[in-house]
Amino acid sequence: MDTSTISRNFGYIKSKPDKRDVLITFDKKTIKTFKLTANIKPKIIDGIFDLRKIVTLPQALSEIDQGTLGSCTANAIAYAYAFAEIKQHNRNTFMPSRLFIYYNERMLENSIDEDSGAQIRTGIKTINKYGVCDEHHWVYDPLKFRVKPPIEAYEEAKVAKSVKYARIDFTKDTTIDDRIEHIKRALLSGFPIVFGFVVFESFMSQDVTKTGIVNMPKSYEQEIGGHAVCAVGFNENDKTFIVKNSWGSKWGLNGYFNMPYKYVADENLASDFWIIQEVTDPIINNFDPNDINPDAINLDVNINSGGVVHN
């Protein structure tokens, strides 16, 4: 294995227990309860289930890149929100502004002046409370992470909110296998899952960067951070979940990677599993996907590689 690493920030902060969380449990009956307005029934084909097959996702979602900011939670949540909006309304109305979400996360966590990362719970709550504006109205510029979005962005965000969301409750799952099946049922119900995990050295290797194949961490590997991502499917053949990263489309498998079932389902390695169930139907004035500067989405690893400096 090539163990040379690429400089990256992560930004996932594990949430503390909160009795106010809205919880959801997926069982066999639940899978039948949830329907997709895209009118396409989710199927396991040749042992593979992939939510990307039930909706048409814009390439921009594969290209999102958090750059050197610790905004992984905002990136993962923006992806899940965009997926929910497309799934519900059969159209790509807009690209959620990740920098808008990241600012509001840190505002609620009292860390606006720091590139501190955030909790997934906080990010989910911000798009319920404030909504989210379009990316081309508050472009992802890492140098502006301390800047409060303009009032126009907040006005636009009012029409784009998550009105229903929940954290997956694994209380009744007594084994890793139970958790694996529970996560698969949630995906089969039509929901991408935002979650956080412990990052080890091998995740940063050139092998993973090129192949998108992640292995279970070795006992001698050092823990180097926490990262938030979004699961979109699973592969029964190699026992992995299909996961969306936020490091650009040149990383892994067009921005995605395969993560072992037992990695994702180990409560010591992964936690905070959230879904966005329902969003409002935003009508964004003068929206044109072509207005979004590709460089503002896919920063690649060499943009701002020296770190973000603020005076």
Curated annotation (Swiss-Prot):
Highest taxon, organism lineage: Viruses
Molecular function in Gene Ontology: cysteine-type peptidase activity
Name of one Pfam family that matches: Peptidase_C1
Gene3D superfamilies to which the protein is assigned, alphabetical: Cysteine proteinases
CDD domains, A to Z: Peptidase_C1
PROSITE patterns referenced in this protein's UniProt entry, alphabetically: THIOL_PROTEASE_HIS
InterPro entries, per database record: Papain-like_cys_pep_sf, Pept_his_AS, Peptidase_C1A, Peptidase_C1A_C
Entry's Gene Ontology BP terms: proteolysis
Entry's family note: Belongs to the peptidase C1 family.
Protein name, as recorded: Uncharacterized peptidase C1-like protein L477
